[in-house]
Swiss-Prot record:
One Pfam assignment: Adeno_E3_15_3
Protein name listed in UniProt: Early E3 15.3 kDa protein
Source organism of the structure: Human adenovirus B serotype 3
Keywords per UniProt: Early protein, Host-virus interaction, Inhibition of host caspases by virus, Modulation of host cell apoptosis by virus
UniProt KW Nucleotidyltransferase keyword: no
Family named by the database record: Belongs to the adenoviridae E3_15 family.
Its job: Protects virus-infected cells from TNF-induced cytolysis.
Length: 136
């Protein structure tokens, strides 16, 4: 009786030998795609568990976020749609209404570390971004 694992391993090796570089390229692309899919899942999970005192007003919850891992760095890109604020106050007996609108905001936070836990630090940085760089 033949060993099925050895047979499949031999068959895979023969396929690799027959196809050569094309198979290597496909395997590399497959690994890169799997790494990107893991990064997207990790991002979704990290956003889901993020909690702060700002609640739904936190930039982490309001922004459209993407996470990229390259050979040398990590990049968290964010996009925030237009926002509108309305404020009413009384001056004497007359109400004054102040309306403010801002356009799209896009940016990225980038680091060049080799930590696998970097996503959480980048999300915390995005969360506190309004405190660091007040936009309005």
């Amino acid at each position: 009786m033949t060993d099925p694992i050895a047979t499949s391993s031999t068959a895979a090796k023969e396929l690799l030998d027959m196809d050569g570089r094309a198979s290597e390229q496909r395997l590399i692309q497959l690994r890169i795609r799997q790494q990107q899919e893991r990064a997207v899942k990790e991002l979704r999970d990290a956003i889901g568990i993020h909690q702060c005192k700002k609640g739904i007003f936190c930039l982490v919850k309001q922004s459209k976020i993407s996470y990229e891992i390259t050979a040398t760095d990590h990049r968290l890109s964010y996009e925030l749609g237009p926002q509108r604020q309305k404020f009413t106050c009384m001056v004497g007996i007359n109400p004054i209404v102040i309306t403010q609108q801002s356009g799209d905001t896009k940016g990225c936070i980038q680091c060049s570390c080799d930590s696998t836990e970097c996503i959480y630090t980048l999300l915390k940085t995005l969360c506190g971004l309004r405190d660091l760089l007040p936009m309005n």
